[in-house]
Amino acid sequence: MAVLGLGTDIVEMARIEAVVERSGDRLARRVLSEAEWELYQQHQQPVRFLAKRFAVKEAVAKAFGTGIRNGLAFNQFEVFNDGLGKPNIRLHARAAELAKEMGVTSIHVSLADERRYACATVIIEG
């Protein structure tokens, strides 16, 4: 396997909190998949949840080398946790098509957060 892409993103929690205070759930609806939206609505710290998901999705878009354009949308990258809590990515719609075109065989996600920041790194292999 070869590394096809690497992406990293860091998000300031206060920035996401300001957007949520200003525009309500608009950012969450645009960024989150349906499954993530359900978790967001029930989460004890929804801003923190959203910031972490946003960081991962930005890192995935960077790893693909495309950013969010040409039919790609944040909600096509779904972040979920395995039984041990490790973050993973599930791809939908155009994101899944792009992964197939690129020959992606695995996507690795690392996510860290502290009081003020969330940081994600994504490696795509094929």
Curated annotation (Swiss-Prot):
Enzyme class, spelled out: transferase
Entry annotated with the keyword Cytoplasm: yes
Alphabetical list of InterPro entries matching this protein: 4-PPantetheinyl_Trfase_dom (IPR008278), 4-PPantetheinyl_Trfase_dom_sf (IPR037143), ACPS (IPR002582), Ppantetheine-prot_Trfase_dom (IPR004568)
Enzyme Commission code: 2.7.8.7
Cellular component, GO, one term: cytoplasm
Necessary cofactors: Mg(2+)
Gene Ontology terms: biological process: fatty acid biosynthetic process
Keywords annotated in UniProt: Cytoplasm, Fatty acid biosynthesis, Fatty acid metabolism, Lipid biosynthesis, Lipid metabolism, Magnesium, Metal-binding, Transferase
Domain of life: Bacteria
Compartmental location: Cytoplasm
Reactions accelerated catalytically: apo-[ACP] + CoA = holo-[ACP] + adenosine 3',5'-bisphosphate + H(+)
Residues reported in the UniProt entry to bind Mg(2+): 9, 58
Keyword Metal-binding: yes
A Pfam family assignment: ACPS
One term of GO molecular function: magnesium ion binding
Family per similarity comment: Belongs to the P-Pant transferase superfamily. AcpS family.
Function: Transfers the 4'-phosphopantetheine moiety from coenzyme A to a Ser of acyl-carrier-protein.
Listed name of the protein: Holo-[acyl-carrier-protein] synthase
Upper taxonomic lineage: Bacteria, Pseudomonadati, Pseudomonadota, Gammaproteobacteria, Enterobacterales
Record gene name: acpS
